[in-house]
Amino acid sequence: MIERGKFRSLTLVNWNGFFARTFDLDELVTTLSGGNGAGKSTTMAAFVTALIPDLTLLHFRNTTEAGATSGSRDKGLHGKLRAGVCYSTLDVVNSRHQRVVVGVRLQQVAGRDRKVDIKPFTIQGLPTAIQPTEILTELVAERQARVLSLPELKERVEAMEGVQFKQFNSITDYHSLMFDLGVIPKRLRSSADRSKFYRLIEASLYGGISSAITRSLRDYLLPENSGVRKAFQDMEAALRENRMTLEAIRVTQSDRDLFKHLISEATSYVAADYMRHANERRIHLDSALVLRRDLFSSRKQLVTEQYRHVEMSRELAEQSGAESDLETDYQAASDHLNLVQTAMRQQEKIERYQSDLEELTYRLEEQSEVVSEASEQQADNEARAEAAELEVDELKSQLADYQQALDVQQTRAIQYQQALQALERARALCQLPELTADNAEEWLETFHAKEQEATESLLQLEQKLSVADAAHSQFEQAYQLVVNIAGEVSRSEAWQTARELLRDWPSQQHLAERVQPLRMRLSELEQRLRAQQDAERLLQEFCKRQGNAYQPEELEALQRELESQVEELSLSVSDAGERRMAMRQELEQLKLKIQELTARAPVWLAAQDALSQLSEQSGEALEDSRQVTEYMQQLLERERETTVERDEIAASKRAIEAQIERLSQPSGAEDARLIALAERFGGVLLSEIYDDVTIDDAPYFSALYGPSRHGIVVPDLSLVREHLQGLDDCPEDLYLIEGDPQSFDDSVFAVEEHEKAVVVKIADRQWRYSRYPEVPLFGRAARENRLETLYQERDRLAERYATLSFDVQKTQRTHQAFSRFIGSHLAVAFDADPEAEIRLLNTRRGEIERALNAHEDQNQQQRQQFDQAKEGISALNRLIPLVSLLLDETLADRVEEITEELAEAQEAARYIQQHGVSLTKLEPLLSVLQSDPQQHEQLQESYVLAQNSQRLAKQQAFALTEVVQRRAHFSYTDSAGMLTENSDLNDKLRQRLEQAEAERTRAREQLRQYQSQFTQYSQVLASLKSSYDAKRDMLKELSQELVDIGVPADANAEARARARRDELHAALSTNRSRRNQLEKQLTFCEAEMDSLQKKLRKLERDYHQIREQVVNAKAGWCAVMRMVKDNGVERRLHRRELAYMDGDELRSMSDKALGALRLAVADNEHLRDVLRLSEDPKRPERKIQFYIAVYQHLRERIRQDIIRTDDPVEAIEQMEIELGRLTEELTAREQKLAISSKSVSNIIRKTIHREQNRIRMLNQGLQAVSFGQVKSVRLNVNVREAHATLLDVLSEQQEQHQDLFNSNRLTFSEALAKLYQRLNPQMDMGQRLPQTIGEELLDYRNYLELEVEVYRGADGWLRAESGALSTGEAIGTGMSILVMVVQSWEEESRRLRGKDISPCRLLFLDEAARLDAKSIATLFELCERLEMQLIIAAPENISPEKGTTYKLVRKVFQNHEHVHVVGLRGFANEIPSLPPIAAELQQGG
């Protein structure tokens, strides 16, 4: 027997009070004991979170919150966690003894919403010795640990060999793996399945009878029969599609004639207009080409005239340009003459100002000498006046000193003081610190010698200064002349500059004398140069007309060549006429041949269209009539072969359909009579009992039961005996087996298994040997597998049958087409292509026309060459006499050379004219400039310095003399002598003072006189300088104006300018007469051009009109062609035989088709509107749009499941082939798809009966359950009365309601809903659709009512309601219901899970104190019998004797809260012991 999987342990990491705690779970009951707040609910919440990590469902409320709608904001999970990473894991060992750790990582999310982030994961292959806490935490110290994050956990697990870590982003994937491994009992595919599972866990956790589960017991206990519902839905969908296809076939059959008529008339309507427009476009193109040829020829003629006009206009323009140039030159010559006259007048002014300037220069020099002498006298007078003033002041100071000496002592003291002052003054003045009264006499001699030397030097300088004053005025005059001539030069370079100027003076005079001869030579060369330029212009014009560049020496040879060319051209023109006549005759013959072939082309094109259609249908290249007849014989043979093969496929298909119908019987009965017999005998078909057998076991059981696998299992054979009397409607062999259908097994036979076979001992003397069938049919899975194969084979045969039927019809129609072709087109179909011959002839005609045009062009070109050659000869006659002038290449250089020499001579003449007088004056003064112009000033400065030196020497000598004279004052022995001497000295001083004052007065008077005279001289000098500067500035302005005028101002310039003006006037008159002559010729040429242009404008107008028509037609035609090609209708519309009909015939054909189309589309609004728009003759593309719309309309009417083409024309052909065959097949298919109402009733009843039996088996497990006064619990299953009536009517009275089930407008579901409403008119169905109601009626669960009943005391069986039971009884009853649901889920999921997996069973019960000891013992017994685990949360006063009990105590130590846990094993039959089961891991920092 398969061992059931168990939860080994629950691990909490970093929960509130649990840092790292693992609870080992008992195989039966695990009790969490502790006071309020000890952590029991937290532990259960961790378990539930690991089991169902869905935040939309989790809500951990207190029992006091039961019935509350909101509860705490975080739904009880956020507050149970601590900050950081938290884990809740379940350690599971399944039936395969595989250890799996499933769990979640939880983490609080910061914010006011108190959210929690959950990540589920699994660990597979973890060794048994490793505890979950060792994986989830990491030891930091001896009593400290750290919680690993999820990535760290993944790294640690993946580092272990053979251990797999998997993280889930989807809860569905997480639960899918848990289901496959046997952790949960039911596959949770959706959120609704998770909600059911959570409601079950929640009801278990909080105890009592959950209204959420009791109200939905059908959803919890009864499995959904999705296969039956899907079969009904598929059947209805197939019937709906079948009916829609049949309806489409009927509509298509009715529209087939409309298809033919519409496509035929639309093709005639649009193709006729299409080809008419194509023909008109070709005609317009031909007309446009003819007009273009005429236009081009007229343009060529006009171009010739225009060329002549351009040539004359060019010559006129040249003459006009030359006239303009001559007028400009004439005006320039007149202006030049005026300028020469102005320059002559300007030169006269310059000469007059130069003479005035020379006179002013002389006067200025004289006055400068006078002012210089006055300045010197002024300086002498100022010096004498200053010396007189100093002498008077000194004498006055000496006299005042002597007058103050009133007595001897005072006088001695004064004298002594004066002696000391004189000594100090002498020391300072002589700069002799060592001077004393004793050595003063010696120094006096030295300074007397210095004074004498200074005086002699002064006399020498006075002598030199007098000489320099005489030469100073001449130097200034010569220097001013140099500056006037050469510009600003330094005084030191004046002599050298003057020498150079005088040296260049003779050469400048020589150049000035050559001006007149050079001007005459230049005039002669310029005249020849102008003649050469005129000749070059004529040569350039000649080369331009000839189109080649010729050298002057080549002109004579060219003249001879042009004369010979004229002779040749005159001969070639005469031969052109005969050749033109021959080409025109050939052109007429080609036109006649083309007309004949054009009449044959339509018949041949019609035959080719028919032949191409036959080639497309046959896939053969039919090249002659023999191949056509041979292919007809092949068609007859192919039709016979295909018909035989089709009949064979139809027989095979019927055999497979019969086998499918036999295998599709409900309950696996190959004979429908067995189902009725089973109901009559009250038994069950053996195939129905083994309906769930797997496909792997099907061969064994099929061989085991042999022929009896179609037997009926009855509870008692004796009760069946009476029914066998007179039994006629049954198979030939009917097997009856006695046994309980609910617990039937194969123990009734003695079996020996062999390889791929069994030996069954039916009796002691009777054995049966049966081999495993190659295709087992026992069990639903085997039948479905076989049916799938048969369905595929049937579809293949149906497809092949359809293909063969289509081929037969197609072959028949192809044979008929070949017969029509032979009768109508065989005679002309294989003739040569007339259109190809027409194209060749048209090509030849185009060649001849082009050759004719080329001939005309060549002839015209030769005439032009003839005229051009004659014109060239006349031009050469003018050019040849000028060849020598053209070959003179040095003429321009010589003109340029003479021009440069003349410019130099004129420049020299202007120089001599301007500076000749100054050079004449400068020549005798050249020697004066040799001395440095600055020496006079330096001499004056030396003289002043010498005067100062002499004065200083005198003062020094006077000071020393005074010291020597006062040497006696340094002694004080003789006072009287000193007084006498003092009195004499005083008198002398007074006399000298009087003389000095008189001298001072005379010096002042003389200084005033000289100052007045000097002022007068300076004013005169300033006046002269001002006049000189004004005259000089005016002379510079006049000279600059003369330079700006830019013409020579000599005597012959005016005569030359006047001669040049007269010459240009004569040339201008000659040019004007030639221009008038050209204007007259141009007028005649323009008259001829006007006549040509009028003709050309008419041709252009006609050509542009027809070209505009062609262009507009081309734009529309391009749109039409693009539309035609994009939609693939070119082959239908481009009917070449219509190209040979004229426009009236095509228009008549289109109008007839239009009338028929108006009637055909009268009922179709869209096509009617498109047809109305297409009638616009200016918009041919609208007819194409109508044709496309018709095609699209017909294409939309084609069902692709019926006809294998998108082309309506081909669809019409295929339609006739397919419609009849499809109608027959679909009608038969509808009869096979239809299901009888009795079969539906039997299926639903069988399903209800099976589920009732299953629930009765579940009830047997709850009969011994008792809680308090409740002695037993059971589940009642009843069929609703209204639904039971519906089943009876479906099985017994279906003939009365065939109007519903035989209606093609109602599906089976809708008919079932209508029948239900008819049977229950009092029920309000609301706004629900019949289809929805019918689908609900096909679900057997809606036929059943489920109620939970309890047997309680004297009341007997009562409905289980919380109000009628105590709390403990309600908890126990609810637990019983939950156990039943879990069992139901396990059975329902058995086929989805591996055979070797028995899932874990575990429920919860919080606050179990409401149960008494007996009820708890009942729970223990229930868990033991059902191999179920239970986790109970109980207060401290409960001490169960079985299972495992954990004592939880919440403690606070140093602000750290943790739960102390002690675990105890049960001690009912053992010695009590209190060791802890799991060591407590102290909470880490």
From Swiss-Prot:
Region of interest (Flexible hinge), ranges: 666-783
Binding positions (ATP): G34, G35, N36, G37, A38, G39, K40, S41
UniProt keyword annotations, A-Z: ATP-binding, Cell cycle, Cell division, Chromosome partition, Coiled coil, Cytoplasm, DNA condensation, DNA-binding, Nucleotide-binding
Top-rank taxon: Bacteria
GO molecular-function term, one example from the UniProt record: DNA binding
Main location: cytoplasm
Subcellular location: Cytoplasm, Nucleoid
GO cellular component, one term: nucleoid
Alphabetical list of Pfam families matching this protein: MukB (PF04310), MukB_hinge (PF16330), SbcC_Walker_B (PF13558)
Ranges in coiled-coil conformation: 337-480, 509-605, 780-805, 835-915, 977-1116, 1210-1235
Any single biological process term in GO: chromosome segregation
PANTHER family: CHROMOSOME PARTITION PROTEIN MUKB, DUF4476 DOMAIN-CONTAINING PROTEIN
Recorded family membership: Belongs to the SMC family. MukB subfamily.
Function according to Swiss-Prot or TrEMBL: Plays a central role in chromosome condensation, segregation and cell cycle progression. Functions as a homodimer, which is essential for chromosome partition. Involved in negative DNA supercoiling in vivo, and by this means organize and compact chromosomes. May achieve or facilitate chromosome segregation by condensation DNA from both sides of a centrally located replisome during cell division.
Subunit and interaction comment: Homodimerization via its hinge domain. Binds to DNA via its C-terminal region. Interacts, and probably forms a ternary complex, with MukE and MukF via its C-terminal region. The complex formation is stimulated by calcium or magnesium. Interacts with tubulin-related protein FtsZ.
Entry comment, domain topic: The hinge domain, which separates the large intramolecular coiled coil regions, allows the homodimerization, forming a V-shaped homodimer.
This protein's name: Chromosome partition protein MukB
Organism: Yersinia pseudotuberculosis serotype O:1b (strain IP 31758)
